[in-house]
């Protein structure tokens, strides 16, 4: 609910940042669903499935 509310209020030029490292995760496997807006993800590893599944995903790795 909060995610849908956030996405409806956000502008098209601002992309949300998901910091997986701050929450103790370093991998993005692509098993969930992503919104249609561009997303910036901070992660150490991104699987091929996640890359194929998301065209508008920007990954920042350490």
Curated annotation (Swiss-Prot):
Pfam families: Ribosomal_L27A (PF00828). The keyword Disulfide bond does not apply. Keywords: Ribonucleoprotein, Ribosomal protein. GO terms for cellular component: cytosolic large ribosomal subunit; nucleus. GO terms for molecular function: RNA binding; structural constituent of ribosome. It comes from the Eukaryota. Belongs to the universal ribosomal protein uL15 family. This is Large ribosomal subunit protein uL15. It comes from Candida albicans (Yeast).
């Amino acid at each position: 609910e909060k995610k849908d509310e956030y996405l409806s209020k956000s502008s098209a030029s601002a992309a949300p940042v998901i910091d997986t490292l701050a929450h103790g995760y370093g991998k993005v496997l692509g098993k969930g669903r992503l919104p249609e807006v561009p997303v910036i993800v901070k992660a150490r590893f991104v699987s091929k499935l996640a890359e194929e599944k998301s065209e508008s995903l920007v990954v920042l790795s350490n």
